[in-house]
Amino acid sequence: MPAFDIVSEVDNVELKNAVDNATRELATRFDFRGVDASFELKGENIKIKAEDDFQLTQLVDILRGNLAKRGVDARSMDVKDAVHSGKNFYQDIDFKQGIDPLISKKLVKEIKASKVKVQAAIQGEQLRITGKNRDDLQAAMAIVREGDFGQPFQFTNFRD
């Protein structure tokens, strides 16, 4: 029976490359000359530091652009509020890994409401979709792509 998995993951290598590119771009920007600003990557968390709140938003925009260039979907970013400490502003950005249980229930509900002849099963932080033929699975993929669930999804482990 054909099946595939729906997952929501961020490629850590591409994330590191995007942060490195953003750091390089930061070094060449004229408006950041002589400014104490930086990106720091720890696991799936990025800590941004700048001297001004406006510069912090500029750094987030630089990071979003570099993430897009590297193929990392910006919807997986969870931007926290800016914190002012001393003369610097700090902001944490987390990246969502895995599908939240509430979102996975919404996905299952949406797929079942579409009357496509597939079965959806929640398996931890991923979803397994099984069906009788490939066309039904591709219809389920289209439903997931069209829906706005607030995070990006990848389709893996496609079996015939």
From Swiss-Prot:
One of its GO terms (molecular function) is nucleotide binding. Keywords: Nucleotide-binding. Signal peptide: none annotated. Pfam families: DUF520. It comes from the Bacteria. InterPro entries: DUF520 (IPR007551), UPF0234-like_C (IPR035571), UPF0234_N (IPR035570), YajQ-like_sf (IPR036183). GO terms for cellular component: cytosol. The keyword Membrane does not apply. Gene3D superfamilies: 3.30.70.860, YajQ-like, domain 2. Belongs to the YajQ family. Nucleotide-binding protein. PANTHER family: UPF0234 PROTEIN YAJQ (PTHR30476:SF0). This is Nucleotide-binding protein VSAL_I1728. The lineage of its organism: Bacteria, Pseudomonadati, Pseudomonadota, Gammaproteobacteria, Vibrionales.
